């Protein structure tokens, strides 16, 4: 059996409690008739409608419109929105966009945080805690863009398991110059996604949701971090190293001893 994912439901307005009740009935009827093999994509960008605080039990949330044409796509803005919401909203429900960084470069001339200053892999990586959304036309992408396939294939291998954990923000708020990231918590294991933005230090200590004083084995799945075994400090602190600015690592971790 294959699950059907419906296109984005846009243009929706809920003007009254009666309308809200009727919409619930509609969604529930579709799920009942399809044996719950349908996922709705709900647009939360305008009007009075469902979003990350309501109706999110029915599928994914299309969170925001960002376009290089409008010069309102900055990778750290998108990452920051996901990071800030993830403490309160299931991150795995949020569709998070990455764009064609080769378009409209003239609109960002001289800007440190312009999309073209990041690798395409990094732009994709900023979306991993949510539902990655390639918010672009595939036409006229350069050949370089298609090397992303190896990274999307690597991601698919652990995406479901990572999304089945509780995803919370770690590190500092994304600012374009921070060490930041996410943690997916399961019982004695989970995942860490750590980003080094345009920060001068190649090594830092990141506060996590791990207990203090436990030994943690971290295996890199994506990005450019090295395998490590470390003991957590206060606030679950771990020392992380990444070789370059605007870089990242995805670790699968396991707690080896627990006090």
Feature roles, as predicted:
Residues 7, 41-43, 193:
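A cross-family glycoside hydrolase active-site/sugar-binding cleft signature
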Residues 126-171:
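Aromatic- and carboxylate-lined catalytic core of secreted/periplasmic carbohydrate-active enzymes
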Residues 2-4:
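Positively charged, low-complexity/disordered segments
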Residues 209-225:
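Solvent-exposed beta-hairpin/edge-strand motifs
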Residues 173-214, 248-254:
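Carbohydrate-binding surface patches
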Residues 18-140:
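Glycan-recognition surfaces
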Residues 7-20:
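The substrate-binding groove and active-site-proximal loops of carbohydrate-active enzymes
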Residues 6, 228-259:
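C-terminal beta-strand-rich structural cap/linker in extracellular carbohydrate-active enzymes
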């Amino acid at each position: 059996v294959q699950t059907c994912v419906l296109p984005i439901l846009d243009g929706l307005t809920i003007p009254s409690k009666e309308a809200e009740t009727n919409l619930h009935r509609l969604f529930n009827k579709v799920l009942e008739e399809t044996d719950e093999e349908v996922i709705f994509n709900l647009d939360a960008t305008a009007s009075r409608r469902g979003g990350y605080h309501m109706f999110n039990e029915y599928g994914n949330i299309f969170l925001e419109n960002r376009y290089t044409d409008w010069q309102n796509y900055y990778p750290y803005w998108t990452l920051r929105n996901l990071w800030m919401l993830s403490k309160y909203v299931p991150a795995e429900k949020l569709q998070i966009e990455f764009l064609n960084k080769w378009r409209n470069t003239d609109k960002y001339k001289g800007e440190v945080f312009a999309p073209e200053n990041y690798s395409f892999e990094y732009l994709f990586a900023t979306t991993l805690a949510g539902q990655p959304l390639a918010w672009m036309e595939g036409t006229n992408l350069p050949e370089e863009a298609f090397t992303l396939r190896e990274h999307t294939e690597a991601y698919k291998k652990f995406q479901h398991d990572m999304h089945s954990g509780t995803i919370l923000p770690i590190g500092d708020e994304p600012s374009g110059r921070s060490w930041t990231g996410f943690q997916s918590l399961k019982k004695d294991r989970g995942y860490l996604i750590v980003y080094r933005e345009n920060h001068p230090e190649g090594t830092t200590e990141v506060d996590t949701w791990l207990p203090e004083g436990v030994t943690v084995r971290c295996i890199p799945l994506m990005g450019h971090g090295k395998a490590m075994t470390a003991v957590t400090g206060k606030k679950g602190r771990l020392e992380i190293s990444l070789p370059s600015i605007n870089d990242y690592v995805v670790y699968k971790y396991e707690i080896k001893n627990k006090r």
